[in-house]
Amino acid sequence: MSSGLSLERACAVALGIVASASLVAAGPCDIYSSGGTPCVAAHSTTRALYSAYTGALYQVKRGSDGSTTDIAPLSAGGVADAATQDSFCANTTCLITIIYDQSGRGNHLTQAPPGGFNGPESNGYDNLASAVGAPVTLNGKKAYGVFMSPGTGYRNNAASGTATGDEAEGMYAVLDGTHYNSACCFDYGNAEVSNTDTGNGHMEAIYYGDNTVWGSGAGSGPWIMADLENGLFSGLSSKNNAGDPSISYRFVTAVVKGEANQWSIRGANAASGSLSTYYSGARPSASGYNPMSKEGAIILGIGGDNSNGAQGTFYEGVMTSGYPSDATENSVQADIVAAKYAIASLTSGPALTVGSSISLQVTTAGYTTRYLAHDGSTVNTQVVSSSSTTALKQQASWTVRTGLANSACFSFESVDTPGSYIRHYNFALLLNANDGTKQFYEDATFCPQAGLNGQGNSIRSWSYPTRYFRHYENVLYVASNGGVQTFDATTSFNDDVSWVVSTGFA
């Protein structure tokens, strides 16, 4: 017993040394290693997760010419070099194509392939995330997270060193606590290698959202739960654990870990405070979860069978070998808090003023007499001038409102149909009455940025940041720069998505 206590004391001292060091002196994976449960996968687009790491964090691909570049930390153990991305992606769009594994095992995450469910891209692949949808700062330095709309997913089916069978593992992720939905399943962690549902207990991943089809926690969600396949679990029961609280933090630390007939859910505000344990105990009482049958693939943003209806934002996360101690995880949480995650501006370009009336002029050559307008519920472009009828002027005028889903962006209310807003539905822009739902708020929230063609603004969907207001055959869509839809055509994209904002006609 005395030797065990000595070992425990030694580990505690080692952890104390690591935790008390500066951000660069000890990253999360240094702390896990000191605790005897090293990272076998370490993913982040915002910072290095090892104090000595200087390699690539992620790769972006730009729409203008299809070229790629890697984004590394500013210094060893530091924050991502967002300026390199901003320069590389200037006047075009960029997607995150690879999230590199910092552990040295090569467990990189790339575009998820089809499985039990197809993704929306060509050949059933999932979408890639926009490189600009989730700007943040860490200790005042700008970085970008991974904003994942429904249909977006990353995967590695040939991971090295991850837990299989009933082997022990831990994992954490830092997420946006305000970006979620009830669809299946916004996950990060261990999944099937086949992209299909191979049975109970074949997954062990962090889930975040307010899905109630399987398990749930206290209140109405969202919750941190574990996706163990054929069930989102909040505790021992396959249904409800009142000890698993609804989350309201902007930045969330989510923790799941599991070993033989033992697992745990923990969580915290990633910007302050310490971890709380929401469940720690035996495996779920339903059949198939003791022992577990983990397969060792890694997923992000999707379910194990490529269920891809969920949404969320990922900043950083790791998977470990072995079952981390609470003390180790507490030190990791302290490091996350020390990183000082904070929100950053979602907009750029000519400023919009809430309460003002605006009109939006097309900048595409040959169409510059046209303005964004509506005809009933259809949003389109029409030729408008000072001599147009009052009715047409009103149809082409929009009141700027604070973003219904995110106050850092904007919503656009019709001048001639008060209470109705521009929203996207199946990627067409429509004018619909505000029904007060979370879905409508998200569909009707847009973030202006400096115009991609150098004129005015390009207006990006908050909920689908790869997509922008675009006129195509005089009808409005939220379009991506290349894609499976006809209105995603790359030809004249930058011009078609750039709009000059003027004082409203009405």
Swiss-Prot record:
S-S bonds: C29-C39, C89-C94, C184-C185, C409-C447
Signal peptide per UniProt: 1-26
Ranges where the record places region ABD: 344-506
Major localization class: secreted
Glycosylation sites: N91
Pathway entry: Glycan metabolism; L-arabinan degradation
Catalysed transformations (reactions): Hydrolysis of terminal non-reducing alpha-L-arabinofuranoside residues in alpha-L-arabinosides
Catalytic, as annotated region: 27-343
UniProt xrefs under SUPFAM superfamilies: AbfB domain, Concanavalin A-like lectins/glucanases
One Pfam short name: AbfB
Protein family according to the UniProt entry: Belongs to the glycosyl hydrolase 54 family.
Record's protein name: Probable alpha-L-arabinofuranosidase B
Organism of this sequence: Aspergillus flavus (strain ATCC 200026 / FGSC A1120 / IAM 13836 / NRRL 3357 / JCM 12722 / SRRC 167)
